[in-house]
């Protein structure tokens, strides 16, 4: 069953004082929006972008911006921490196969990061809908695109 962030309760959801380095990274993202919503872009067509995120224990993917309708699926579950654009910090437990869908109207977006708090790798697949989204996709660098073996 798909859930939105609002439907799933966080294990913790608090307003915290972020470290200076995190604040600086967030400010840089605001100046230059980061459309890399995953670690690696596996596939891209005129309709979809398919990403993977693989985080080792303690590893973090930096602040990035969601502007397109999308869904993600947790491949193997785990525990993660996100710093959200409203200044809150949330922690979630994810279960294998958990899937969430999010949509954005014209001009709407979400900025957040994700850190693996668990003892095992945390893996997600994210699929962005280019076609049917109210916003245009953000540019992404070639360095995140899957390289053929």
PLM feature segments, named:
Residues 2-52, 82-84, 89-111, 115, ...:
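A short, N-terminal "cap"/entry segment at the start of jelly-roll beta-barrel domains
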Residues 44-45, 53-65:
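Short, surface-exposed binding/anchoring microloops in extracellular/periplasmic proteins
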Residues 62-67, 112, 116:
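His-enriched metal-coordination microenvironments in redox/metal-binding proteins
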Residues 66-86:
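Glycine- and acidic-residue-biased ligand/ion/polar-headgroup-sensing regions
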């Amino acid at each position: 069953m798909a859930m939105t962030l609002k439907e799933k309760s966080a294990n913790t959801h608090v307003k915290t004082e972020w470290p200076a380095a995190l604040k600086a990274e967030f400010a840089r993202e605001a100046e230059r929006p980061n459309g890399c919503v995953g670690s690696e872009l596996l596939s891209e067509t005129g309709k979809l972008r398919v990403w993977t995120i693989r985080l080792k224990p303690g590893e973090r993917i930096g602040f990035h911006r969601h502007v397109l309708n999308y869904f993600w699926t947790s491949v193997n579950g785990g525990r993660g921490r996100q710093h959200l654009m409203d200044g809150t910090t949330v922690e979630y437990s994810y279960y294998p196969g958990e899937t969430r869908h999010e949509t954005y109207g014209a001009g709407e977006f979400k900025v957040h990061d994700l850190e693996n708090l668990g003892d095992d790798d945390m893996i997600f697949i994210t699929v962005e809908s280019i076609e049917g989204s109210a916003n245009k996709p953000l540019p992404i660098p070639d360095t995140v695109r899957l390289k053929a073996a």
